[in-house]
Amino acid sequence: MNHRSIFETVVLKIQELLQSKNFLDAHRLENHFVRKRLLSMYQVIVFLIYTTKQKLDTNIGNIRVDLPTLGFPKAISKQAVSKARQGIKPSLFQALLDLSVDAFYNNISKKNYWQEKYSLFAIDGSRLCLPPSKSNFEEFGHRFSRMNPKREWSEALASIAYDICNDYIVHGLIWYSLSSERKMAKCHFSAMEKLNLLENAIFILDRGYYSEDLFRFFYDKGCFCLMRLTESLNIAKKCSKTSLNTTLAGNPKNGTVDIPIRVIRVDLGNGTTEYLATNIPEEEIPTGLFKELYFKRWPIEQKYDEIKNQHLIEEFNGRTSTSIQQEFYINLLMANLASLIKADADEVIETNAKPTNKYRYQANRAYIIGRLKKIFPPVVIRQLPVDAIIVIFDESSNVKSQIQPGRSCPRKKGGKGRERKHFYNRKTAV
């Protein structure tokens, strides 16, 4: 299947699941949505998919106009909507995300690879600023301002496994703010193992992930990994040349054995030196390619930028831990759907590109996200046919932005550090 066909498959399957009593019953709390109320579970789910970053009252008013066939009740308060959504398990939206992943990897006819062989997966975490509430404090942790202890908020640790070559989120987690990113990485790996995605896979992880335990984990699983090292580690200090082949000593008390480890020294050209640890042998990938390979992980940073600044994931509409998790998985689902549209549009743009063009072009992702957010909900409830959303594929190939190679933005250091960003009484007007 091509990207359009996969997109259509995902939409049709979502339509089917949201009409399935067995599916809905599996993802509702006990004693919720068992009586006939003003709001049905189906209406609440569609509302959560539809809702924008505006105030809740505005969204309630808009959904009656934009989705008249949904039959959203008029005499309903925002408190009733907020209470009703608590009866829906976040696992429902996680299941929809998993559906998009299964549909892609089981049906894609032409996957992208690095060096025409390797699947590249990046794993990385990022903190999300949450609205202050008792529920979030208990589930995700309690934070205070350094300057003013009375200013309090919560943070969650989000982590995703990302297919670099195919611009697709494979798995996502949102945990307590002080959770172990290494433990989350193992959970991502287990999920991908079930999807049979490990053949010729290389996992790329940033500084902070390396530990002997995690390195052994990948080695024991027979899977390639590449981890950035901190300069203070002994194995990094020992690497005075371009590469070093050494051994991680085993410990009989822990049941571990000696395993080989390869350390690569990379000079960035600006006076900075980085060290990489890998279990990939020299005959598989030569030393000279590791600088290129490591920098292939940069798209996961761009994916977090997309999720935070285009999907505005931190502008949560709900204040409870259940609401946070619901919206987290909805945003990852929308990011994957947008990626399907962009991949198709990019192919059209590349096919129609002229050799005389100064720059290469790509589809404008912000445009795709905005159009998708508007058209997806009425298609889900069958108010519009699936063809209505397929139109975005054709439109997106005409809304382009330049690809300018070599652009960079130095990271700002210092400053006040992380402060509260989520203000519940400050919502966008659009």
Residue locations for each model-derived region?
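Conserved beta-strand elements of the Class I
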Residues: S119-F121
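Short alpha-helical "recognition helix" segments of helix-turn-helix
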Residues: N62-D66
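Blade-loop segments of beta-propeller domains
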Residues: T69-L70
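Single, function-defining residue in the core of a domain
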Residues: M1-I60, K74-A75, R85-I88, A95-L97, ...
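Short Pro/Gly-enriched beta-strand edge/turn motifs at strand-loop
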Residues: E139-S145
